[in-house]
């Protein structure tokens, strides 16, 4: 038996040589796979329903990014818990570059929001690796065209006259709409009632359908309804007026320091190989500077704000520090 095993396995030196060769082939194969990346379709996970800011950004990017990568880019909506379910899916995905998150600004506060609510966070931000920021928009405060309020001052006066009687739709607890409205409410010393829906698209439909009195939305989400005369913009949450809404004042002009921007950016799972990340970053850079993408952004009224990974990481970290304070101030929601 010993002789037979010896013949099969060879000498210890031969066995070591075989094992070393196998390891080398494995390492070479992995390196080759990274060099050839991508060899199959890439999925952009949108953690919100269709029709919202993350969905619009993802669908504008998909085709030009596919052209840059020479591979199919799919857009998959995975909504739930204000975007946390989709973000967690990407955070826990295989770090091979084929599963990418199109996140909104709420991605940096969702873990803290879960803790404030007494629940375990579905993911932590260090489980995601920044690729690029694509856009950063102020929110537009909206009412229906038949609303009695024609200015932000009208709405705030009504809220002060009858505290707790004005409701608004949101994309979910601690999401961009919720945070932007509560920041203004705090500054104006008013009480507004949040009615959470499962995303920016459903939130907009709730306002149009008369289920709520007001909401806020990214310009791209609101533009068509404003143009059609169905919605009236009262104010914007940015530092300056929007080019597409030059007659609509900012919160700051009305005397309220409640600046808020909803941004959209791409993340990969932490642990994605550097070579793969570099390919993703370079291809995104090429895609977002293509005429197809820039014209699409302009048509939708989205403010293009491209930042590569290092700048995006710094931007998101600073925004997260600021917005986590807002989450803690709001506190647990019953």
State the predicted function of each range.
Residues 39-41, 186-190, 250, 274-334:
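An extracytoplasmic/periplasmic, membrane-proximal ligand-sensing/linker region
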Residues 65, 92-98, 113-202, 251, ...:
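Hinge/capping helix and adjacent helix->loop/strand transition within the periplasmic-binding protein
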